[in-house]
Amino acid sequence: MDISFKNVSYIYQENTPFEHRAIEDLSFTIGSGSIVAIIGHTGSGKSTLIQHLNGLTIPSRGEVRVGDFVLNQDGKPKDIRNLRSKVGVVFQYPEHQLFEETVQKDIAFGPQNFGVNEQEIKERIASILPSVGLSDSVLERSPFDLSGGQKRRVAIAGVLAMKPQVLVLDEPTAGLDPRGQKEMMTMFDHIHHEQNLTTIFVTHNMEDALKYADKVIILNKGQKFMEGKPLEVLRQREKLQQVQLDTPEVIDFIDKYNHRFHDNLIYQNESIVDIAAEMKRRLDGGQHE
């Protein structure tokens, strides 16, 4: 689904002494099937932005379009329920939202509330489990008896059981160790391509934005600060420093190598291990002193 924000502002407690502009005059487009990273510090407007995508928040000014759905200051569209079935949101620490007696009931909760029949729900669960790295042996277990990582995967399965066309991820790797972060992002990348989704993820991890996103949008104090292809945006060190953000470590690594050895090695979405191997090959080949 195509997504667009046109001059969108959201004002908390408007016309009161506590008025606060969470986002201001945001305009951008997200093409169907793309992966977009939203980056910014706490208070930059990231969470408010993504809450507009399924109508949890309605613009104070401007217009949001998600496919054929339109959200503006006139209020929520009449078919808001349909919109929410098509936009799946995985909030931070989604495992905290588990509540049913069994894993199966938790995953089935959303589809049941949207009138999906039992047979269809069973088929959806069976197809989703491998995608999130779970086996059917967990279905009759209490979600509260699972490990933290398994709980998160169950919560994600519950969102995917709705068969969304848009997947919104709010800090999907929060609280995970480096290995868990890598596994989680690899899983989402696979799901994105397997199900042909439009995916938006909020992140503080510049490496993930560089590796997985087709587009990066950086927010600062509720306004769009930068937008573009990841490599073009995330290598602009001086501009990023204006909003207390750093370039990805892999870009720093390549830039320092190129400066030291007068080379022109270019980042092409390789791992740091592969890049180091290429550097060694060049140096061993005597290309540089």
UniProtKB/Swiss-Prot annotation:
Enzyme Commission code(s) on record: 7.-.-.-
Top-level taxon of origin: Bacteria
CDD domains assigned to the protein according to its UniProt record, in alphabetical order: ABC_cobalt_CbiO_domain1 (cd03225)
Gene3D superfamilies: P-loop containing nucleotide triphosphate hydrolases
Ranges of residues in domain ABC transporter: 3-246
Binding-site list for ATP: G40, H41, T42, G43, S44, G45, K46, S47
GO cellular component: a single term: ATP-binding cassette (ABC) transporter complex
Membrane topology recorded in Swiss-Prot or TrEMBL: Peripheral membrane protein
Assigned keywords, A-Z: ATP-binding, Cell membrane, Membrane, Nucleotide-binding, Translocase, Transport
Any one GO MF annotation of this record: ATP hydrolysis activity
Subcellular location(s) per record: Cell membrane
TM helices/strands, residue ranges: none
Classification via InterPro entries: AAA+_ATPase, ABC_transporter-like_ATP-bd, ABC_transporter-like_CS, ABC_transpr_CbiO/EcfA_su, ECF_ABC_transporter_ATP-bd, EcfA2, P-loop_NTPase
Family: Belongs to the ABC transporter superfamily. Energy-coupling factor EcfA family.
Subunit details: Forms a stable energy-coupling factor (ECF) transporter complex composed of 2 membrane-embedded substrate-binding proteins (S component), 2 ATP-binding proteins (A component) and 2 transmembrane proteins (T component).
Function in brief: ATP-binding (A) component of a common energy-coupling factor (ECF) ABC-transporter complex. Unlike classic ABC transporters this ECF transporter provides the energy necessary to transport a number of different substrates.
Record protein name field: Energy-coupling factor transporter ATP-binding protein EcfA2
Organism (species): Oceanobacillus iheyensis (strain DSM 14371 / CIP 107618 / JCM 11309 / KCTC 3954 / HTE831)
Source taxonomy: Bacteria, Bacillati, Bacillota, Bacilli, Bacillales
Gene transcribed to yield this protein: ecfA2
